[in-house]
Amino acid sequence: MDCDIFLVGLNHRTAGVDVRERFALANHCDEEHWALPCTGAVSESIILSTCNRVEILAAGTGEVAEQVLRNWAGARKSDVEDLRPYVYVHKNLEAVRHLFSVASSLDSMVLGEPQILGQLKTAYRKAVKSRATGVILNRLLHKAFSVAKRVRTETAVASSAVSISYAAVELAKRIFGDMRAHKAMLVGAGEMAELAAMHLLQAGIADILVANRTLVRGQELAKQFNGHAIPFEDMPRHLLDVDIIITSTGSQEPIIRARDIRAALKIRKNRPMFFIDIAVPRDIDPDVNGLDNVYLYDIDDLKEVVEENLATRRDEAAKAAEIVNEEVVQFSRWLASLDMQPTIVDLIKKGQRAAEEELAKTLKRLGPVDDNTREALEAMAGALVRKLNHDPIMFLKHGGMSQEGNGPRISIMRRIFNLDKTGCIYSEEN
């Protein structure tokens, strides 16, 4: 393979929510894509930016990881050295393994949750639309999707998985106990909000408000759960009516300020308010934490609820990891074939030319022969070429791809079989 695959990223393990929101790229994918493709070291790239991770998958030659870091930091108007301490870099097979694990939800905060696969598919569609992908990443992403499907089909890793939204509602139940007497508001109307609405209903809350920048989408979600949609700009004055607020927008700035909540608390006579901010960047001003009778949790605070649900799926995760490893090996063979294919083709052609030359000399010595004899000789020559080429081709194909690449093995094969010289294979003197 003439280029390498890199995965550069940070996630909920390497960076807190404050860092993740600082370097989030969710709103930068469409408009810029940082001009990564076809510039410098990078030839293909895909950006995955969610509440729990920002990862850039790139293919190219040379200083790919450094270029990705520079463009990433530049897109967020930050210094690359501020980003570097939180970042991991995977190369080639380790990048492939990590991507397969992410797609299969083995690297998620919520092991087995289904949202990440949809988010990855969306990221891929955006990259394709931006013409940022090519042969390598197209093949890799489609393989990742099939690996995720195989993991879900052959293991029970997702059978009892909780979503972030489920964890948020569970946390609310710990604060309020009986949820039936309380009202809730969802700020945002995406997949997270839809899941939250479902879990709120199951917990006993029948009165749900939905505030969304696009009122029509808010109305669609509210209709599904017999709720009420409100204009986004009216959201602050409705804070006094609700006890539980779950936010999940894509805003780059806080949309709920401490002053808004302070005003609501006065009218509510300090009745408790419970906020769960599952957006990255965060939707709620962190200063809200300083207010009495206000419980504010962000996405990192949900880990305890998630951990309680994890034990039952660890054995299944081990089975899923085995599937990932098998698929990495399979993909490595395809990768290896990319740079080995020219050598394999040259080897086959050289064998065919040698067979044709020797067959021509043999037929000349034999003189006129019937068609059956000619066909038998041609078949024998072809069979000999295939048998003689079998072991060298297997050596090339099944060596897999190492961190050092396949160059040394290809170079040896080309030297042994003298593939870089043209002309006749054998002369009369041979």
Curated annotation (Swiss-Prot):
The keyword Oxidoreductase applies. It catalyses: (S)-4-amino-5-oxopentanoate + tRNA(Glu) + NADP(+) = L-glutamyl-tRNA(Glu) + NADPH + H(+). Pathway: Porphyrin-containing compound metabolism; protoporphyrin-IX biosynthesis; 5-aminolevulinate from L-glutamyl-tRNA(Glu): step 1/2. The record marks 98 as: Important for activity. Its EC number is 1.2.1.70. One of its GO terms (molecular function) is glutamyl-tRNA reductase activity. The active site is at residue 51. NADP(+) binds at residues 188-193. Belongs to the glutamyl-tRNA reductase family. Possesses an unusual extended V-shaped dimeric structure with each monomer consisting of three distinct domains arranged along a curved 'spinal' alpha-helix. The N-terminal catalytic domain specifically recognizes the glutamate moiety of the substrate. The second domain is the NADPH-binding domain, and the third C-terminal domain is responsible for dimerization. Catalyzes the NADPH-dependent reduction of glutamyl-tRNA(Glu) to glutamate 1-semialdehyde (GSA). Homodimer. This is Glutamyl-tRNA reductase.
